[in-house]
């Protein structure tokens, strides 16, 4: 549940944790007041790249590079995404949904190129690893969607890595 005690009731986002909150055009712009922007309100598979794409989209809305459509078009767009989200049945579909959402935001701005298909593939692998073993899924290594380089596997299994200091991380 999101909590915004500093906002007037008329502009508070009221929703449970979901992939596409209603009342937010492109998941960012408050439907009834286009000067109010919310970032990161979605349940997340994509985190930083989604936040970045949202921020670049918000920047372009503020700067007037992205023109807001009519109220009817905004409503149709929100309803389309909410309806698609409500039909999702499993994590793979949820990953596909959020990948498509993030790609759409990406394509609306000049955000640098990123390999969303590789990200989609990695998230699905990660989700299956999590189902296979909740204690070891974090011990996997993936390639960067920007550089393609593969991260080394961490020297200590996640379950037993109790010292998360930089010194321990870098010295083992």
What are these regions (language model features)?
Residues 19-26, 33, 120:
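Alpha-helical scaffolding within the catalytic cores
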């Amino acid at each position: 549940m999101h909590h915004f005690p500093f906002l007037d009731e008329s502009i508070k986002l009221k929703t449970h944790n979901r992939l596409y909150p209603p009342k937010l055009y492109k998941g960012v712009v408050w439907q009834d007041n286009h000067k109010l922007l919310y970032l990161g309100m979605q349940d997340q598979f994509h985190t930083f790249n989604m936040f970045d794409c949202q921020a670049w989209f918000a920047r372009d809305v503020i700067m007037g590079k992205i023109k807001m459509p009519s109220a009817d078009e905004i409503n149709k767009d929100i309803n389309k995404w909410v309806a698609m989200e409500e039909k999702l049945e499993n994590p793979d579909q949820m990953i596909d949904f959020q990948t498509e959402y993030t790609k759409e935001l990406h394509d609306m701005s000049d955000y640098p190129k990123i390999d969303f298909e590789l990200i989609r593939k990695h998230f699905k692998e990660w989700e299956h690893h999590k189902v296979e073993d909740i204690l070891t899924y974090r011990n996997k290594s993936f390639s960067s969607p920007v550089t393609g380089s593969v991260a080394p596997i961490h020297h200590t299994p996640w379950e037993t890595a109790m010292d998360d200091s930089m010194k321990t991380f870098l010295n083992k």
